[in-house]
Regions:
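Residue-level signal for the nucleotide or nucleotide-sugar donor/cofactor binding architecture
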Residues: 23-26, 63-66, 88-97, 125, ...
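A short C-terminal helix-loop "cap" of Rossmann-like NAD(P)-dependent dehydrogenase/epimerase domains
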Residues: 10-16, 44, 71-83, 137-149, ...
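Amphipathic terminal alpha-helices
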Residues: 166, 180-199
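Catalytic helix-loop patch of NAD(P)-dependent Rossmann-fold dehydrogenases
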Residues: 2-49, 54, 61-64
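Glycine/proline-rich active-site loop of Rossmann-fold NAD(P)-dependent oxidoreductases
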Residues: 30, 55-70, 79, 84, ...
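Non-catalytic, hydrophobic alpha-helical segments
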Residues: 99, 103, 118, 130, ...
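Hydrophobic alpha-helix immediately C-terminal to the catalytic Tyr-X-X-X-Lys motif of short-chain
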Residues: 31, 35, 39, 71, ...
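C-terminal "lid/loop" region of Rossmann-like NAD(P)-dependent oxidoreductases
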Residues: 86, 113-116, 128-131, 139-160
Length: 199
């Protein structure tokens, strides 16, 4: 989304080219939501759309290429992290227990046909800040290299992602509870114990 639509509300219609390099990712989500809405509006099927934002926590697979399992696996294997671009891209992170509570609230009490953002809008942190937090947890320096985006990586990667969860707060009394630092610490400790380092 453009900067004026971040934090992003459920009502935001998107800013994606249907033939752009990210289309396979974004359009597949859009198709899923469209099908749910069609069944709701035409067939009376009770549906909701849940839009999760960067859910993380223990139990993620080491082969998952999202930032936390990817970084931790490389660190365990003593392999420098690869930071695409400047490292100033920002994201928010929602711990798994907070996400699951949000999902359940939507399933049980969501207004049929409505979409709900599930995430934790605070804090919005950069990739470099995340690395510093991991360093503090591990008690050691983490090596990393800033590299260009590979050709296989979709272009137009958003510089910021942050949900507006005011609708969920108002309608479903949803409040993320787990501080991101605590969540990252528990997650990294779990990864250290169970990851084999595949890199």
């Amino acid at each position: 989304p453009d900067s004026k639509n971040i934090p992003t509300k459920e009502s935001y219609k998107g800013n994606v080219s249907c033939i752009g390099p990210r289309a396979c990712y974004d359009e597949s989500k859009r198709v899923g939501e469209t099908l749910c809405n069609i069944y709701h509006n035409l067939k009376g099927v009770s549906t909701n759309t849940i839009r999760p934002f960067n859910v993380f926590g223990p139990g993620m697979q080491e082969t998952d290429y999202r930032v936390l399992p990817n970084f931790t696996s490389r660190i365990k294997g003593n392999i420098p992290l690869q930071i695409y671009g400047t490292g100033n891209q920002t994201r928010t992170f929602c711990y798994i227990t907070d996400a699951m509570e949000g999902f359940i609230r939507v399933i049980l009490n969501g207004v049929p046909g409505e979409a709900y953002n599930i995430g934790n809008p605070n804090p919005e942190i950069s990739v470099i800040e995340l690395i510093k937090k991991i360093e503090a947890i591990l008690g050691k320096r983490v090596k990393y290299n800033k590299v260009d985006y590979p050709d296989s990586y979709p272009a137009d990667e958003p510089n910021r992602r942050c949900p507006d969860i005011s609708k969920c707060k108002k309608d479903l009394f949803y409040r993320p509870k787990v501080d991101w630092k605590k969540g990252v610490k528990e997650t990294v400790e779990w990864y250290k114990k169970y990851f084999n380092s595949l890199f």
